[in-house]
Amino acid sequence: MPHSYPALSAEQKKELSDIALRIVAPGKGILAADESVGSMAKRLSQIGVENTEENRRLYRQVLFSADDRVKKCIGGVIFFHETLYQKDDNGVPFVRTIQDKGIVVGIKVDKGVVPLAGTDGETTTQGLDGLSERCAQYKKDGADFAKWRCVLKISERTPSALAILENANVLARYASICQQNGIVPIVEPEILPDGDHDLKRCQYVTEKVLAAVYKALSDHHVYLEGTLLKPNMVTPGHACPIKYTPEEIAMATVTALRRTVPPAVPGVTFLSGGQSEEEASFNLNAINRCPLPRPWALTFSYGRALQASALNAWRGQRDNAGAATEEFIKRAEVNGLAAQGKYEGSGEDGGAAAQSLYIANHAY
């Protein structure tokens, strides 16, 4: 076997590794604010707000205007293309607002899922064309990490070997291209919670998917110390009749990661996958209390599970912006504690935080 050509210099590797470690510093996670225009339409329609560019800007401003309390619990924010070039009411670019808090700016770079021909409704993710040029531009515009989401689903016949292999290779190509441009890739192979499968089945599929992803990353010479993983937690299907404890979910999740994710990876930033805000926090907390050795930071990269209460409090009204921002800060602080296994629960049984955020066949 010939030697691989050294694609990255020592300086490039150090930059990537430093960025990744900043994002997942102890007690810090990621705010995923990269919902597409279509996804924002769904969010805003829930509160009776029209999906205009200005309303999307105002809503993102609610999140980004959080004060310095978020410095200790948010290490990175994932932007959508439109948001990367928007400004707050005072004309300050959102990118600068986030960077001034010492938080790393990221960007969603995939172009969405498309059908994978010859499969039972499975998908791959598009967006590799022109990705290198886009990454170079995003780097100039202030982004230091990126996100790419692939989607797999569990049923009697899926995920197929073809879908697993194809999505693993797409993620590896994306990761390699990002690193060439000084951008840390977040690798997101999401296994959807749709279905009635139990915890064991999800664990088995998660292990097979992650094993394929890390084989592909190795084949593509991706520098693991300069990457992050954004997986699903191992949970039962949404229609599964069995209820599992956070401790059972934590044990299954950490076991799957220990069997597949190399210790060179600095951090695992879980997606919330339609869990309620409280559920996502309790499960993350249990994962960080799991008695198994865990060589990586285990933290959050939450969208809905950081935003649902804030969105509910805002309802499109300027007068509600301050209260909505407080709701976001509260969730960020809670998850910062959960990322250290220090969350004891809020004592709130009801309210928006306990509402399921599940959406069937969730597309971003």
Curated annotation (Swiss-Prot):
InterPro entries: Aldolase_I_AS, Aldolase_TIM, FBA_I. Pfam families: Glycolytic. GO terms for biological process: epithelial cell differentiation; fructose 1,6-bisphosphate metabolic process; fructose metabolic process; gluconeogenesis; glycolytic process. The record marks Y364 as: Necessary for preference for fructose 1,6-bisphosphate over fructose 1-phosphate. Coiled coil: none annotated. SUPFAM superfamilies: Aldolase. The active site is at E188, K230. It is an enzyme of class 4 (lyase). GO terms for cellular component: cytoskeleton; cytosol; extracellular exosome; extracellular region; ficolin-1-rich granule lumen; secretory granule lumen; tertiary granule lumen. Pathway: Carbohydrate degradation; glycolysis; D-glyceraldehyde 3-phosphate and glycerone phosphate from D-glucose: step 4/4. Transmembrane segments: none annotated. Substrate binds at R56, K147. One of its GO terms (molecular function) is cytoskeletal protein binding. It catalyses: beta-D-fructose 1,6-bisphosphate = D-glyceraldehyde 3-phosphate + dihydroxyacetone phosphate. Keywords: Acetylation, Glycolysis, Lyase, Phosphoprotein, Schiff base. It comes from the Eukaryota. The modification N6-acetyllysine is found at K111. The modification Phosphotyrosine is found at Y5. The modification Phosphoserine is found at S36, S39, S45, S132. Its EC number is 4.1.2.13. The keyword Iron does not apply. Belongs to the class I fructose-bisphosphate aldolase family. In vertebrates, three forms of this ubiquitous glycolytic enzyme are found, aldolase A in muscle, aldolase B in liver and aldolase C in brain. Homotetramer. Interacts with ATP6V1E1. May interact with PLD2. This is Fructose-bisphosphate aldolase C. It comes from Homo sapiens.
